[in-house]
């Protein structure tokens, strides 16, 4: 974004509000919730603008219920509202949404706004298995809001020895977004994705040695859509060093559309 040889800017943000959790009598049921506002400020040249601007907006506004005790084999957690959410390690649904911090919004590089515009989340855990259902509306720039929503379920397994595996299905039941193609415009609404993830944080029994991979296949209920995405990541966590640093390398690939075919092949991430 620099004009000339260099550019300078300053940005800051602060989030403030109330959050709490309470137990219902002597039961194994807890109620929780949060309401916060976020004030952000920028001055100088960032990627989009060079003026001075400030913004205060609602960030979190959610409530939920947790059922279960720490010594139980099972637990459940249900919540709804504006809140931060991430699926697995964020390959497909990340807690950091670029669209919620771009354009006119201050503090672009700090990326302070992380709440989804709306969520309905449910988790049921039994021993090492967890089933998570979700319906989310990502936060987007107001005047570019595509009204896209996503609904799905993720079944995951985590072993005491560090092995992790998950199987995911989700779709977009509502969206105003369309993608251009040689055969016309392709709607996001109706897009479906199947995803599998496998990895370990203690590969070959070596604690801290990590290897993870994930593969996603995307189709559509109404049009010819065949897109793929995957990543592989290897790393090591130095647990005995201060701050437990992690050194890793990740390779990721997302398919693009081939205009010479009638099939739409661009992965929608």
Name each region found by the language model:
Residues 2-14, 20-78, 91-100, 104, ...:
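Surface-exposed loop and membrane-interface regions of Gram-negative outer-membrane beta-barrel proteins
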Residues 81:
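Glycine-rich, aromatic-flanked loop segments that form ligand/cofactor-binding clefts
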């Amino acid at each position: 974004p620099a004009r000339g040889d260099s550019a300078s800017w300053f940005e800051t943000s602060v989030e403030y509000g109330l959050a709490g959790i309470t137990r219902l009598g002597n039961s194994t049921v807890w109620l929780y919730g949060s309401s916060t506002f976020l004030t952000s400020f920028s001055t100088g040249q960032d990627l989009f603008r060079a003026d001075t601007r400030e913004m205060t907006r609602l960030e979190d506004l959610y409530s939920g219920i947790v059922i279960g005790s720490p010594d139980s084999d099972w637990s459940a957690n249900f919540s709804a509202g504006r809140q931060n959410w991430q699926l697995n390690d964020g390959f497909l649904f990340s807690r950091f949404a670029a669209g919620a911090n771009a354009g006119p919004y201050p503090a672009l590089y700090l990326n302070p706004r992380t709440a989804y515009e709306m969520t309905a989340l449910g988790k049921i855990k039994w021993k090492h298995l967890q089933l998570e259902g979700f319906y989310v509306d990502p936060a987007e720039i107001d005047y570019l809001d595509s009204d896209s929503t996503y609904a799905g379920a993720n079944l995951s397994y985590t072993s005491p020895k560090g092995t992790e595996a998950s199987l995911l299905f989700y779709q977009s039941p509502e969206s105003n977004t369309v993608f251009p193609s040689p055969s016309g415009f392709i709607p996001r609404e109706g897009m479906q994705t199947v995803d599998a993830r496998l990895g370990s944080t203690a590969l070959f029994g070596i604690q801290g040695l990590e290897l993870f991979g994930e593969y996603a296949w995307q189709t559509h209920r109404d049009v010819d859509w065949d897109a793929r995405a995957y990543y592989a990541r290897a790393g090591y966590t130095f647990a005995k060093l201060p701050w437990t640093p992690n050194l890793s390398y990740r390779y990721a690939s997302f398919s693009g559309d081939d205009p010479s075919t009638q099939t739409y092949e661009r992965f929608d991430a």
